Amino acid sequence: MTTTKTVREISETYFTAWQAGDFETLRELLAEDVDFVGALGTASGVEEALAGLKGLGRVLEKIEVHARVVEGDDVITWFDLHTSIAPPAATANWSHVENGRITRIRVTFDPRELLAAMGR
């Protein structure tokens, strides 16, 4: 029997997998043509998106979710991004889901302290 995950469950799984470094699960959640735009860059397609997630994943310590709002196929997650190199960053992530996969991601946060810690 096949079960279909809800948009909320897909979002929850995305953040849990990213925090755990489970990039195979992330690959299954992302559409092949996923489009990502964030404070640190952009990515077109699943390979570029995974590369970006892996890059930030090297310093990721914890994702502390404060709220998740779902409306139709859209979900906004408000969280603190804890890294090993900068103070926690309050972050908003909007994702759009189609046919059980994340097709678009937009992320916003103040990247100044993280960029400074990265020497950029």
Question: Residue locations for each model-derived region?
Answer:
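Short, flexible active-site loop motifs that bind/organize anionic cofactors or intermediates
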Residues: 13-16, 39, 92, 104
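Aromatic side chains
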Residues: 14-15, 36, 79, 109
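A solvent-exposed, acidic/Ser-Thr-rich amphipathic alpha-helical stretch
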Residues: 23-25, 31-71
